[in-house]
A protein has these predicted regions:
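Bacterial N-terminal signal peptides that target proteins for export
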Residues: 1-15
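Subset of outer-membrane beta-barrel
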Residues: 31-313
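Short hydrophobic "helix-edge" motifs at membrane interfaces and signal-peptide entry regions
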Residues: 14-17, 171-173
Length: 313
């Protein structure tokens, strides 16, 4: 009986942790932007300078279900579109992200624009701007672990306009990017006696390159660093292989918090589908069955005289 009671206490504590993550006090901060394991194929969600980087019209959808089996766990759905404009100096894109964690949810829609300049025969540096709005809702009073007046914890339909910037340099085999997708630190909600919550500015640094191991196998190491004031640095390290320009497979390590693997299949020049599985190495890992992330992407090439090469990133 005591072990059951202890399990319930741990469960309640974890749910309270979700509540705190959903409505963060202004005096503290933590990672708020959605995590992506397949970040190297979903770059536009956090870096507007990525728009049009493959010189095709790209449509990508991704669904991430974190901590499966844990009630109220985060889940994220993302839809991304982007393409270069005629002349290929300018590119436009857009993204819609629906993010749910515990009793809080936010749906955001952003437009992206990138200006691209050549830095070599096959390399470009892009400067990007992102602008849009998020709709935030939360009902922390629905959690039995929070014993306060419900009126203090309800946020219904809070609009959060924001904008961001990004830099992205790439060649056929290398890339590096820096971005801050939301520069405004919007106040989400406040109550003099309970909580004052806000958004926090996040910075993303990414990089990677591709090495030919032999004629059938390529190796691509990559990384992502996420930084926000007052929170531990989040670092993803990835090692992926591409077999015969068809199948991606590899592993991921998230510094001090998780590990996993991913795979992707290239059906043809246009269609790709990918899957990633993460395991949490922190204490909350004992209460969930891992994280699943599924991605599908389709490229349209309006330049019929050009063949689409394999997408490395």
């Amino acid at each position: 009986m005591s072990s059951l009671r202890g399990h319930r206490m741990h469960w309640s504590a974890a749910m309270l942790l979700l509540a705190v993550a959903a409505l963060r006090p202004a005096g503290a901060s933590a990672q708020q932007d959605p995590l992506y394991s397949q970040y190297m194929f979903n770059t536009l969600a956090y870096n507007p300078a990525y728009a049009g980087s493959a010189d095709v019209f790209t449509m990508m959808a991704l669904s991430r279900h974190q901590w499966v089996g844990f009630a109220g766990a985060p889940n994220t759905q993302t839809l991304v579109l982007h393409s270069p404009l005629p002349g290929r100096t300018l590119a436009l894109g857009g993204s819609v992200v629906h993010d749910v964690i515990g009793p809080a949810k936010q749906t955001s829609a952003f437009l992206d624009a990138a200006y691209r300049i050549r830095t070599g025969e096959r390399s470009r540096l892009a400067f990007g701007l992102k602008g849009g709005v998020g709709l935030y809702q939360a009902d922390l009073a629905s959690l039995s672990t929070v014993q306060v007046e419900s009126a203090n914890l309800n946020i219904s339909g809070k609009l959060l306009p924001n904008f961001g910037f990004g830099l992205y340099w790439h060649s056929p085999r290398h890339y590096v990017g820096l971005s801050a997708p939301r520069l405004l630190e919007n106040t989400i909600g406040s109550d003099g006696s309970v909580v004052v919550s806000k958004e926090f500015r996040h910075y993303h640094l990414i990089g990677g390159y591709v090495i030919d191991v032999n004629r059938d196998l390529r190796f691509k190491p990559s990384f992502m660093v996420r930084a926000v004031q007052g929170a531990p640095l989040s670092v993803d390290l990835n090692a992926n292989f591409l077999l015969r320009d068809k199948v991606w497979f590899g592993a991921m390590y998230r510094l001090s918090s998780g590990m996993g693997f991913m795979a992707q299949y290239r059906f043809n020049d246009q269609l790709r589908a990918g899957y990633a599985f993460d395991l949490t190495t922190t204490r909350i890992g004992a209460y969930n069955a891992g994280t699943h992330e599924v991605m599908i992407s389709y490229d349209l090439n309006f330049n019929t005289g050009r063949t689409i090469s394999p997408r490395f990133f």
